[in-house]
């Protein structure tokens, strides 16, 4: 965190005048008004390793970590609408290749259901209390306004009617100031800071960036689609179009999977990151007009700036 600059606004709605002074690609902002100029921060790293967590502990033990045990009834959760971006319908591309996965193992248990207001998304843990998701799952792009943090809940490893690792409330929402002020989809990413440390139990994803092409790298996407009853579903493909800030693939996705990790289980000796489960992007969009958008779903790619931003947020208390 050395070299980071902070500005305290203390408002949920950030004024246009305030955002004009801080909205550049390296700036990140929280819903309680903390602004970090991440351009002043260089980690010197390009990869963060994954951790499988302890995998132990009944829900009762997790309550000591701040996990909120009172759960919303499944019947009510099923009425929550999947949050989707303003463009791009998350899409089944031909045959539906999704398969149900179970959350009693890593990394599936490190992926969770996010609910807020009457909406839902997917998120994944990168730290004991840090969840990564899509930007449009924390704020409407271009609105300078976050959604109401007090309504957020995170269900790590949700499995149908079961919340095996409890329910966590949220103490901060984060995103890029560029997403918040302009809605530029290349900066569509977000993060939650939890009032619990459930990542110690369920495990945490590794993540990496590289300036090299990721073309043909395997892509696994696992999340909570709106057409399924709160089960976790997964699809496998590969990077088919590589861009600096976007990755395109034909993994099948449906609304509700926004924020899912785009990852692979990388063997020893693999380039860029090896011997663990690593994310390379955040699933955000489905098909819309114009190639390659009209024939692929796609992710916000983890580039060097986003990599540094995620580390900075993970290091927040």
Where are these regions (language model features)?
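Conserved catalytic-core segment of clan PA serine endopeptidases
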Residues: 86-109, 113, 118-120, 139, ...
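Protease-domain processing segments flanking chymotrypsin-fold serine proteases, especially trypsin-like
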Residues: 25-126, 308, 312-316
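Chymotrypsin/trypsin-fold serine protease catalytic domain
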Residues: 160, 170, 174, 185-257, ...
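Sec/Tat signal peptide C-region and signal peptidase I cleavage site
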Residues: 19-25
């Amino acid at each position: 965190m050395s070299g980071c600059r902070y500005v305290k606004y203390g408002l949920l709605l950030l004024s246009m005048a305030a955002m004009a002074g801080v909205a550049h690609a390296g700036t990140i902002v929280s819903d309680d008004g903390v602004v970090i100029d991440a351009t002043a921060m260089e980690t010197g790293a390009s990869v963060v390793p994954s951790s499988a967590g302890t995998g132990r502990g009944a829900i009762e033990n997790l309550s000591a970590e701040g996990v909120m045990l009172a759960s919303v009834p499944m019947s009510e959760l099923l009425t929550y609408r999947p949050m989707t971006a303003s463009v791009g319908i998350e899409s089944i591309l031909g045959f539906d290749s999704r398969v149900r996965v179970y959350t009693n193992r890593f990394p599936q248990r490190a992926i969770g259901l996010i609910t807020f207001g009457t909406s839902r998304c997917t998120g994944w843990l990168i730290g004991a209390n840090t969840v990564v998701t899509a930007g449009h799952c924390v704020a409407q792009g271009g609105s300078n306004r976050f959604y109401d943090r007090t309504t957020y809940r995170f269900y790590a490893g949700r499995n149908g009617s079961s919340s095996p690792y409890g329910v966590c409330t949220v103490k901060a929402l984060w995103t890029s100031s560029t997403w918040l002020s302009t809605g530029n989809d290349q900066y569509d990413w977000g993060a939650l800071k939890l009032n619990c440390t459930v990542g110690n139990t369920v495990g945490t994803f590794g993540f990496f960036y590289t300036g090299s092409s990721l073309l043909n790298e395997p892509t696994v996407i696992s999340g909570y689609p709106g057409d399924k009853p709160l089960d976790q579903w997964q699809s496998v493909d590969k990077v088919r179009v590589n861009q600096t800030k976007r990755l395109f693939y034909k993994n099948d996705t449906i609304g509700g999977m926004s924020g899912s990790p785009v990852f692979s289980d990388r063997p020893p000796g693999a380039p860029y990151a090896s011997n663990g489960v690593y994310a390379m992007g955040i699933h955000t969009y489905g098909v819309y007009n114009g190639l390659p958008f009209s024939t692929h779903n796609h992710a916000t790619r983890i580039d060097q700036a986003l990599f540094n931003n995620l580390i900075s947020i993970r290091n927040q208390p």
